[in-house]
Design a protein with these regions (language model features):
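Long, contiguous binding/interaction regions
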Residues: 35, 39, 44, 63-81
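Catalytic alpha/beta core domains of metabolic enzymes, predominantly
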Residues: 11, 115-249, 253, 261-264
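Catalytic beta/alpha-barrel core
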Residues: 63, 79-92, 101-116, 128-140, ...
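N-terminal amphipathic alpha-helix/helix-capping segment at the start of soluble metabolic enzymes
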Residues: 1-19, 73
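Glycine-rich, proline-tolerant flexible connector loops at the mouths of alpha/beta enzymes
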Residues: 47-66, 229-238, 294-305
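Hydrophobic faces of well-ordered beta-strands that scaffold small-molecule active sites
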Residues: 16-22, 44-48, 82-84, 103-105, ...
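Active-site mouth loops of central-metabolism enzymes
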Residues: 16-33, 57-61, 80-86, 106-107, ...
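Domain-level signature for soluble enzymes in the chorismate/prephenate branch of the shikimate pathway
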Residues: 259-353
């Protein structure tokens, strides 16, 4: 994927690049008040939702085109760049006409290739930064596919926004981070800037600060944070928005670590990791060899491949062993689920010969 820098004039290259503003543009006064407070804290890029794709009808679905005039006024009054979400070709045309500086594609839209293609077609011949949120479901290929569609339309100033993934289980997060997915995105497209959206991942303002720090520790390039002049009275997502003062406090507390060249001591530790990985692979190979022998025995004696009782016993015992060794039981469960799946696959090959 051929990419160019998304940075606009006057935006520093140091991490994090911050995009901040309310979830929704509600009134002209609210938009301007929030923008002026953020600008006073040194923020350069303003965000506000003009069209809001709500899960169910009846909620506030955005102020619409009227709000674009307010964003134009933000640019004029504060000098900030302005950004908003687009979900249709009509949104794109209205934003371009209003001089919006940065566009982003929302999670629900990213999940629909037809909608993404419509947006990509509307952007042909335009040079504007476009950020693409991850789809609501944890599908990396769908996320990359959306980026590729827009890139194929000729846009090179692209970035990704990690806002977490929808889950029925909302014990801690509104949307599960599943950090391994944006990490894999970074591995696949190393020069793609990645922003973290702690507001949508956490769903609660008290989670914004730790999520911002975690994103920085994972070498994310930027943050897109919902900030409102009066969060408790917000018309949408009130619980996850913070005031400009609180946002400034959070940003000032961030510890920004750098990627440095490996020192000799770090190189030695990594060598130990490599040796451990080699040992793991060798031991897994031995385990699969025994699993194949078991598969042969099952075939000869007419025994089914899947033995549910034995499988449950393995998961319980290995989970407990892992906890005793300082590892998370859920982590152990995932590992042995994957090992069991491969064992079953190899035994099925023997059974079906």
């Amino acid at each position: 994927m051929e990419l160019e820098s998304i940075l606009l004039p006057g935006i520093e290259t140091k991490r994090p690049i911050v995009i901040a503003g309310p979830c929704s543009a509600e009134t002209e006064e609210q938009v301007m008040d929030t923008a002026k407070q953020l600008a006073a804290k040194g923020q350069k890029i303003y965000r506000a939702g003009i069209w809001k794709p709500r899960t169910k009808p009846g909620g506030f679905e955005g102020i619409g085109v009227e709000g674009l005039a307010w964003l134009k006024e933000v640019k004029k009054e504060t000098g900030m760049y302005v950004s908003t979400e687009v979900a249709t070709a009509k949104h794109v045309y209205e934003c371009l006409k209003a001089g919006i500086d940065i566009l982003w594609v929302g999670a629900r839209t990213t999940a629909n290739p037809f909608a993404v293609q419509e947006i990509a077609d509307a952007l042909k011949g335009v040079d504007i930064p476009v950020l693409v949120k991850n789809p609501v479901n944890p599908d990396l290929e769908l996320w990359i596919g959306a980026l590729e569609r827009i890139n194929n339309a000729g846009l090179k100033r692209l970035g990704a926004i990690h806002r977490g993934f929808s889950s029925y289980d909302k014990k801690i997060y509104r949307n599960l981070p599943q950090w391994h997915i944006p990490i894999e995105l970074r591995r696949r497209i190393p020069n793609l800037p990645i922003f973290c959206d702690p507001s949508h991942i956490g769903g609660k303002r008290e989670l914004v600060a730790p999520l911002c720090q975690q994103a920085m520790d994972l070498n994310f390039d930027g943050l897109i944070v919902e900030s409102h002049c009066n969060p408790d009275c917000a018309w949408s997502d009130a619980s996850q928005q913070v005031t400009p003062d609180v946002l400034d406090y959070i940003l000032n507390l961030l510890v920004i670590r750098t990627e440095t060249q490996s020192t000799e001591s770090l190189a030695q530790l990594r060598k130990q990791i490599d040796e451990c990985d080699d040992n793991i692979i060798q031991e897994l190979s031995k385990r699969m060899r025994v699993a194949r022998e078991i598969g042969t025995y099952k075939k000869e004696h007419g025994i089914t491949v899947l033995q549910a009782g034995r499988y449950n016993e393995i998961l319980e015992k290995r989970g407990a062993q892992g906890e005793q060794c300082g590892m998370d039981s859920e982590f152990m469960k995932k590992i042995f689920e994957a090992i069991h799946e491969e064992s079953v696959r190899q035994q099925m090959e023997i059974i079906n010969k």
